[in-house]
């Protein structure tokens, strides 16, 4: 049923007829949902599980279930972000942007965007984030918008600096701009690598100490630019999970977990992998462990990690991941956000897989967290009915 009701790729952009959190109509910019589902079905071994493994395990008295959940994530909302990119006389590149960073990998992924435009190594790009002394315009890091909005602002500024570099290098080397390339911190002539000039030297020469600056130009190799998306980009994906539930303790063990994600063009696969895995871990906490308890006076009873349960290394499974890339038409980099992709579908996925594990019982799970005592209580009416 889900496969039959997917929005076809040729129907995008697709108006969802509701208002999104940025107070604009929710319009899905792009997507290709069926390949993601196909990959998830293959990675989880869906057909083999339901045809062979699940019947065998159930015959042995095991309560095993499988779940598959698809989702769409709204990302990359406005209003805007900005950035400044500067090539210093040392040849290093400094970048400043208003967004903050809390471990998303900005220092690597944003540096990659600049390095690709200017032909320098990532190690030679110095990034400053969230410092109003360096760059004071910006909205912030939230709602899976950092890479989409700030990343494209950085890209726009880097493109402007690239244009300045090529223009200045063409003047210094007396060649046409189209005959130049930026490689290894050099502006050099294509096919004649010995005819080159360092970017640091160009930066020094772009700041004349004598004479007038040429009309239509400005000193230095620096640019500031901003990016404000027309609307948010929509990422998507599929999570699949196989679980086993102990009927005595009601503990849920995750036997296999699969994520297939589409966030458009991927900047850094390793960082994306970490984002997804961290989100899944948080989602597992939401689905099975984390809950605040209060007494009749409103006093919080589990205010420390001694008694507030969170997932640990031995309860978070190995997560198999794969990707589908459907570029967003809303920004030059073609990217979509990934900050919440790991967490969004985990609760419904838990509910679906656990319901399947008790298929002989009329079990309907409508809320999380699904702690053992809550699962026990939910099962009692159904168990009594089949007793």
Where are these regions (language model features)?
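Cofactor-binding beta-sheet edge motifs in enzyme active sites
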Residues: 2-35, 42, 47-387
């Amino acid at each position: 049923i889900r496969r039959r009701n997917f929005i076809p790729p040729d129907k995008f952009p697709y108006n969802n007829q509701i208002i999104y959190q940025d107070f604009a109509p929710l319009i899905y910019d792009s997507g290709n949902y069926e390949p993601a589902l196909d990959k998830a079905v293959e990675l989880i071994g869906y057909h083999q599980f339901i045809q062979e493994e699940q019947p065998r395990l159930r015959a042995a008295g095991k309560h095993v279930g499988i779940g598959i959940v698809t989702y769409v994530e709204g990302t990359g909302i406005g209003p805007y972000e900005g950035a400044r990119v500067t090539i210093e006389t040392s040849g290093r590149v400094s970048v400043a942007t208003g967004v903050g960073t809390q471990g998303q990998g900005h220092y690597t992924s944003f540096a990659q965007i600049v390095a690709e435009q200017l032909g320098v190594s990532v190690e030679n790009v110095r990034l400053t984030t969230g410092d109003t002394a360096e760059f004071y315009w910006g909205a912030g890091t939230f709602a899976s918008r950092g890479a989409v909005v700030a990343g494209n602002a950085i890209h726009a500024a880097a493109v402007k600096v690239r244009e300045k570099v090529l223009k200045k290098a063409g003047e210094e080397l007396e060649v046409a701009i189209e005959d130049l390339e930026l490689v290894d911190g050099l502006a050099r002539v294509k096919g004649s690598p010995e005819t080159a000039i360092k970017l640091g030297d160009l930066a020094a020469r772009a700041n004349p100490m004598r004479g007038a600056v040429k009309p239509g130009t400005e000193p230095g190799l620096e640019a500031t630019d901003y990016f404000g998306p027309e609307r948010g980009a929509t990422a998507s994906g599929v999570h699949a999970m196989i679980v086993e539930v102990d009927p005595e303790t009601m503990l849920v063990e995750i036997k296999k977990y699969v994520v297939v994600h589409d966030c458009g063009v991927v900047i850094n696969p390793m960082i994306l992998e970490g984002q997804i895995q961290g989100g899944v871990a948080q989602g597992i906490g939401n689905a099975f462990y984390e809950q605040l308890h209060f007494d009749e006076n409103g006093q919080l009873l589990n205010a420390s990690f001694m008694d507030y349960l969170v997932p640990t290394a031995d309860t978070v499974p190995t997560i198999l991941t794969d990707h589908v890339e459907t570029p967003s038409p809303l920004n030059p980099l073609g990217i979509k956000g990934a900050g919440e992709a790991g967490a969004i579908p985990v609760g419904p996925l838990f509910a679906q897989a656990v319901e399947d594990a008790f298929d002989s019982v009329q079990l309907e799970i409508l809320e999380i967290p699904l702690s053992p005592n809550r699962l026990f209580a939910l099962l009692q009416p159904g168990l009594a009915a089949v007793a």
